């Protein structure tokens, strides 16, 4: 097996949900598998698919919709597994902004988004609510959606329930406002998708590198699976390990984000075919991929027993269960609630 380091480019700066990767490194799971790994963080998350697709990084993480779009644009990338499953994603706003649960209340508002596909999603939704893309102002915010809402440069922005929504809830608490002032219009519900899988965070690979390094790829997946297993077996100990190697993680905000991410984390790392079918069809609807596009994923390197996937009914039931779980964690705390700094 090659002793060269495998470069792994994250989809974002190190974030609580990246824990299995860093724990795999710090606990020696990569070394046990005979591989060396360099974990890299991007300056701009929009560059990740291009950097992996052009061979400047071997492996990495990216959302499902970006993985599909990157392949459609000619970058040879493929998903080899899942890090985080179906985090609730939507238009986040504050009570008093003039926005309500009616999508049409976004008319005349400034809506922030991370990358270009967020704007495409909102533009597409306007068609179903008697609006056009000219009825709102799109503002590209990159990693700073929450900050832009707080500063008032946007009225709402696309974000994740376990990341940007948490940032805003904690800001509200610090400013004598109830956390319930933070609201979300879930994109999957507005678009009638039946899942939030378009923002599932995947492990992706450069296809040329993948073809030449199947043993190293399998070793990487076994190691991050061991990292995930350690997290589920001992969340508090794993969080402490993560904070040891990434001291910036050791903040109250990050602990809450981890609590809110925990239920979304993939236990078996499988690419869920039901979700891929939905998001591939959704991407065709958005015009992100052509009609003859074939989903770019493989489960070849998930070499352990996995639970049956289930059909549409099981997927919808999972979403309802997750909604209940996340509401409980938001109100009562999660796996780290007793952990102190």
Curated annotation (Swiss-Prot):
GO terms for biological process: thiamine biosynthetic process; thiamine diphosphate biosynthetic process. Its cofactor is Fe cation. GO terms for molecular function: 4-amino-5-hydroxymethyl-2-methylpyrimidine phosphate synthase activity from histidine and PLP; metal ion binding. It comes from the Eukaryota. Pfam families: NMT1. It catalyses: N(6)-(pyridoxal phosphate)-L-lysyl-[4-amino-5-hydroxymethyl-2-methylpyrimidine phosphate synthase] + L-histidyl-[4-amino-5-hydroxymethyl-2-methylpyrimidine phosphate synthase] + 2 Fe(3+) + 4 H2O = L-lysyl-[4-amino-5-hydroxymethyl-2-methylpyrimidine phosphate synthase] + (2S)-2-amino-5-hydroxy-4-oxopentanoyl-[4-amino-5-hydroxymethyl-2-methylpyrimidine phosphate synthase] + 4-amino-2-methyl-5-(phosphooxymethyl)pyrimidine + 3-oxopropanoate + 2 Fe(2+) + 2 H(+). Its EC number is 2.-.-.-. Pyridoxal 5'-phosphate binds at residues 115-118. Gene3D superfamilies: Periplasmic binding protein-like II. Responsible for the formation of the pyrimidine heterocycle in the thiamine biosynthesis pathway. Catalyzes the formation of hydroxymethylpyrimidine phosphate (HMP-P) from histidine and pyridoxal phosphate (PLP). The protein uses PLP and the active site histidine to form HMP-P, generating an inactive enzyme. The enzyme can only undergo a single turnover, which suggests it is a suicide enzyme. This is 4-amino-5-hydroxymethyl-2-methylpyrimidine phosphate synthase. The gene is PIG1.
């Amino acid at each position: 097996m090659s002793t060269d380091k495998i470069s792994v480019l994250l989809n974002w700066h190190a974030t609580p949900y990246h824990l299995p990767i860093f724990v795999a490194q710090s606990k020696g799971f990569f070394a046990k598998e005979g591989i060396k790994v360099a974990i890299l963080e991007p300056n701009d998350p929009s560059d990740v698919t291009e950097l992996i697709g052009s061979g400047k990084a071997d492996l990495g993480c990216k959302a499902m919709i970006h993985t599909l779009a990157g392949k459609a644009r000619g970058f040879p990338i493929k998903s080899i597994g899942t890090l985080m499953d179906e985090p609730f994603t939507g238009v986040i706003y504050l009570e008093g902004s003039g926005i309500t649960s009616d999508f049409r209340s976004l008319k005349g508002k400034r809506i922030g988004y991370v990358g270009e596909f967020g704007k495409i999603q909102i533009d597409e939704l306007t068609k179903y609510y008697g609006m056009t893309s000219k009825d709102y102002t799109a503002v590209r915010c990159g990693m700073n959606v929450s900050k832009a809402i707080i500063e008032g440069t946007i009225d709402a922005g696309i974000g994740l329930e376990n990341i940007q929504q948490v940032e805003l809830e904690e800001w509200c608490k610090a400013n004598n406002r109830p956390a319930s002032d933070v609201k979300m219009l879930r994109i999957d519900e507005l678009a009638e998708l039946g899942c939030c899988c378009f923002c599932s965070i995947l492990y992706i690979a450069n296809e040329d590198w993948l073809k030449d390094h199947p043993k190293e790829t399998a070793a990487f997946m076994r190691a991050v699976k061991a990292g995930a297993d350690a997290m589920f077996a001992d969340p508090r100990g794993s969080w402490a390990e993560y904070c040891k190697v990434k001291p910036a993680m050791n903040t109250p905000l990050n602990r809450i984000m981890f609590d809110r991410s925990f239920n979304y984390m993939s236990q078996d790392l499988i690419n869920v075919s039901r979700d891929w079918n939905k998001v591939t069809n959704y991407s065709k609807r958005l015009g992100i991929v052509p009609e003859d596009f074939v989903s770019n994923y493989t489960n070849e390197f998930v070499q352990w027993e996995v639970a049956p996937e289930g059909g549409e009914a099981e997927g919808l039931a999972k979403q309802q269960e997750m909604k209940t779980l996340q509401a409980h964690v938001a109100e009562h705390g999660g796996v780290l609630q007793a952990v102190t700094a």
